[in-house]
């Protein structure tokens, strides 16, 4: 009974927050909110310039591999655990998945700037 109450309160609160987040910004839309802000000055050119999609993909790839390093950093401390086999298997699976992703990215020429 207690668990059902906690789950229902969480669902009600999260639904309320989502509805308010979608409903509130639509109340007062005017042009000043839509303009880009640059230190109080009018922008000299368009602030909404497109950027290279290749740069975006390389940046996302960098973030993924940076996350891999962050996930593998606790391994020296985990070596002290009594069940080292599970820890090493998990680390091997993580590195294998990311290596396969890098190989796929490389074969699809996602890491090259020129097309």
UniProtKB/Swiss-Prot annotation:
Entries under InterPro entries matching the protein: NADH_UbQ/plastoQ_OxRdtase_su3, NDAH_ubi_oxred_su3_sf
Transmembrane segments: 4-24, 55-75, 86-106
Reactions the enzyme catalyzes: a ubiquinone + NADH + 5 H(+)(in) = a ubiquinol + NAD(+) + 4 H(+)(out)
Record's keyword annotation contains Cell cycle: no
Listed GO MF terms: NADH dehydrogenase (ubiquinone) activity
The entry's keywords: Electron transport, Membrane, Mitochondrion, Mitochondrion inner membrane, NAD, Respiratory chain, Translocase, Transmembrane, Transmembrane helix, Transport, Ubiquinone
One GO cellular component term: mitochondrial inner membrane
Role noted for this protein: Core subunit of the mitochondrial membrane respiratory chain NADH dehydrogenase (Complex I) which catalyzes electron transfer from NADH through the respiratory chain, using ubiquinone as an electron acceptor. Essential for the catalytic activity of complex I.
Family: Belongs to the complex I subunit 3 family.
Assembly and oligomerization: Core subunit of respiratory chain NADH dehydrogenase (Complex I) which is composed of 45 different subunits. Interacts with TMEM186. Interacts with TMEM242.
Record's protein name: NADH-ubiquinone oxidoreductase chain 3
Species: Baiomys taylori
């Amino acid at each position: 009974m207690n668990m059902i109450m906690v789950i229902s309160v969480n669902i009600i609160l999260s639904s309320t927050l989502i509805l308010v987040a979608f409903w509130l910004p639509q109340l007062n839309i005017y042009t000043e909110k839509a303009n880009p802000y640059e230190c109080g000055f009018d922008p000299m050119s368009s602030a909404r310039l497109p950027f290279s999609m290749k740069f975006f993909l390389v940046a996302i790839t960098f973030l993924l591999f940076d996350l891999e390093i962050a996930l593998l950093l606790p391994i020296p401390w985990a070596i002290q655990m009594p069940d080292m086999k599970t820890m090493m298997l998990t680390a091997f699976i993580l590195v294998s998945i990311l290596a396969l992703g890098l190989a796929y990215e490389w074969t699809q020429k996602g890491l090259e700037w020129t097309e």
